[in-house]
Every structure is written in C-alpha cells, then in structure tokens.
Amino acid sequence: MQKAGAGGRRASDCGLAPHRPRCITKFAQYVGLLPCGRPGHPGERVAGAAAAVGAEDCPRRRAVILKFSLQGLKIYSGEGEVLLMAHALRRILYSTWCPADCQFAFVARNPRSPASKFFCHLFVGSQPGEVQILHLLLCRSFQLAYLLQHPEERAQPEPCPGPTGEVPLKPLSSSGGLVREPFGRDQLSQNVHALVSFRRLPAEGLVGSGKELPESEGRARHARLGNPYCSPTLVRKKAIRSKVIRSGAYRGCTYETQLQLSAREAFPAAWEAWPRGPGGHSCLVESEGSLTENIWAFAGISRPCALALLRRDVLGAFLLWPELGASGQWCLSVRTQCGVVPHQVFRNHLGRYCLEHLPAEFPSLEALVENHAVTERSLFCPLDMGRLNPTYEEQDCGPLGRPPRTLRPLSHAKSEAELQGLG
C-alpha cells in the first residue's frame, strides 16, 4: 500500500470540487484502530471486543471532527484543517455503539484491500448521547443509500400510527411550505455551546416551495401549542440560567432532513427518479418520525425487503415497526440463529410498554430495547445495536488504471492501516 506524505493534506489544499455534498458535522475523540474479522462470524463480535481492547491499549486519544454525508465519512483534525481519514460509504461494513463505555465504532476496509481484511475504528465521547448520534447518523446513511440504489423496493404509502401510537401521520398535500415547530423540553441540549436549530416540519403543501406561513398564523400556532421553547435565544438563555446543562449535543430534530438533503445533492439523478406524490421521496423526507425510529423501522422501504435484509444482518439485529391498523401495538422482529423471530410489543392501560408473555414494563420503547440488549434470557438472543451496511461492496469497481488517493494517517495509527480517499 502506498504511504501518504508526511506533511498531511490540508482541507484548503484539496482543491475546490465542482460540487461539495452537504454533510453533518460532529465531534468526538479518536482512540485508534484494530484489525478484525467480519462481524457476524462465530466468535467475532467485533464492536464489543475491539472497543474494549482499544480503550485499554490505546490511551492516547485525539480530538477529531467527523463529517457525515451520503457519500461517506470524513474525519478531520480537531482544528478542522487536516483531513485525516476518508471512508466511502460502500467500504464501511458495520457500525455499532456501546452506551456503557460511551464508545462508537465502525468496521471498514481500505481501498483495494482484500475482502477479508477489516479495521475497527473506535471513538469515545463524554456521555452516551454523543456517541449514539454518531452511530445513528451512519446507520441512517446506510439505509438512505440503499433506498436510492433500489427505488423499486420502497414502501407504498399507507396510513399507520405515529411512533407513540397516538396520532397517525398525515400525508403531504400539494401546496404550502415549511413551518417551524417549537422545541419540546426533552429536546433541549445540555450543552451551552451547542448551536440552536429549528425543528422544521411540513406544512400542508408542496415541500420545497420555499413559502413560509404568514407570521400571524405562525404566532397563533405557537400560542395554541403553549410551548415557550420556540426561540433559540430564549432556549439558550434559559439553559444558562437553569444551570442544569451538561456536556452533550442537541438531540436531532433535523438530522433526518439533513441526511436526505445530502442524498438529494449527492445523488441528484437517483433522487429525481423517485416518483412524485404520496409515495415519493417528499414523503420519505418530511413525514417520518425521529432518526432512531426510522432506523429501527427501516423507514421508506417495504417490509418484505426489510425482513430480507434483516436475515442477512448480524445476530441480534432487529426491526421495530407499528402494527397496521392497531393503536399501541408494534412488531419486534429479531434476527436469531433460527431465523427472524417476531415478537409483539404493546402499550398497556398505564401507558407502559411490554413484550408479549413477559411481565417487565418500560416507560418507553427506547427503554424496552435497551433492556433487551443486555438481557440474554428474555429473547432467543439479546438485541444488537449494530447494523450491517446493505450497500457494502467487497471490491472496488473503479478504473483499473486509476491510482489510489492516499491520505496522511493518524500519528498513532499503524502504518499498514493507512487510510485513503473516498475515490
């Protein structure tokens, strides 16, 4: 493998590309990388083992900036000047996170490397929410990339209850614009230095028309909702005065939309090929739920296709979607050694969530999933937060005569694992 120059590559030295895809920027600490086998093979639970060993053997950490897009993941130095690594999405095999250790890890191969040679890259944060969002962004990028490659397998529009089973999602109509929705108290960041962004939801009308609701109507809407958290200035001042802020990042109301805007910009031909109307990409962009719920349900893809992909995923991978025509009921499908096993999840009269034939009750679906991810005897196997990339390619199909683009490795990374460009 060709080594990169010692001087590194600065972002300003890469030249201006004709198109720079939209990306989502996050911060973390890079611990290191370890050679590993393919996830899902017997005895190889890459994420947990590599993360534990990496945390012990690599005490030297480095602050980095991660930039997510539908083309891949780029990692810059803490100052944002030096591009340290770049991973095309098609070369990333697997992503996972460990809330107990505040760790995020993904498994990728190098360009033109053997299909059996992988490296696990480990990152840590100061609290679980910081690393969880890294994992969620990468997983949803996997799914959106698959949807763009296989538009024939998209889900057909059908009425279904929302994430909590209380209010059904409304289809988009044909005129109007976007409105700003106030923040809920549980959506406020615990970080004073975090940027405040509005939650943008579809108004009744044509998405992307750029027309805003009249100011008077917007004020009336906020007054009806009775929520004071509608101004970024007020949100920031109240957070500072309350003195309850902790390190963290804004829980993403807009991450889903940002990823889909990245998809539209990175793959304009595939995006425009999607049909217009209720079943098109506009419904996928604006009418689904949160980032976590979209990943659990593989939002936008048909259920038969989602189940087929689940059968190829790692043991413990799961899908969770609301039952059609039933309020307060969900289907939890888990990939086990016996195949995909479905379980019924319901919400009782106390508003708590239960799994069929099990007495335990949980205040939310997230709590239910987290519990069964660490409990081994409740299901056929514990739930696994990791996800395989359905768009992963074992070989590079680019021009044979094109030399690989190399980048400067991290100072504490092994030379044999120097990372290369997105190419």
UniProtKB/Swiss-Prot annotation:
<feature type="compositionally biased region" description="Low complexity">
    <location>
        <begin position="398"/>
        <end position="410"/>
    </location>
</feature>
<keyword id="KW-0770">Synapse</keyword>
<comment type="function">
    <text>May be involved in synaptic plasticity regulation through the control of Rac-GTP levels.</text>
</comment>
<feature type="region of interest" description="Disordered">
    <location>
        <begin position="394"/>
        <end position="423"/>
    </location>
</feature>
<feature type="domain" description="SH2">
    <location>
        <begin position="296"/>
        <end position="392"/>
    </location>
</feature>
<feature type="domain" description="PID">
    <location>
        <begin position="28"/>
        <end position="146"/>
    </location>
</feature>
<protein>
    <recommendedName>
        <fullName>SH2 domain-containing protein 5</fullName>
    </recommendedName>
</protein>
<comment type="subunit">
    <text>Interacts with BCR.</text>
</comment>
<dbReference type="GO" id="GO:0014069">
    <property type="term" value="C:postsynaptic density"/>
</dbReference>
<dbReference type="InterPro" id="IPR011993">
    <property type="entry name" value="PH-like_dom_sf"/>
</dbReference>
<keyword id="KW-0727">SH2 domain</keyword>
<dbReference type="InterPro" id="IPR006020">
    <property type="entry name" value="PTB/PI_dom"/>
</dbReference>
<dbReference type="InterPro" id="IPR036860">
    <property type="entry name" value="SH2_dom_sf"/>
</dbReference>
<dbReference type="InterPro" id="IPR000980">
    <property type="entry name" value="SH2"/>
</dbReference>
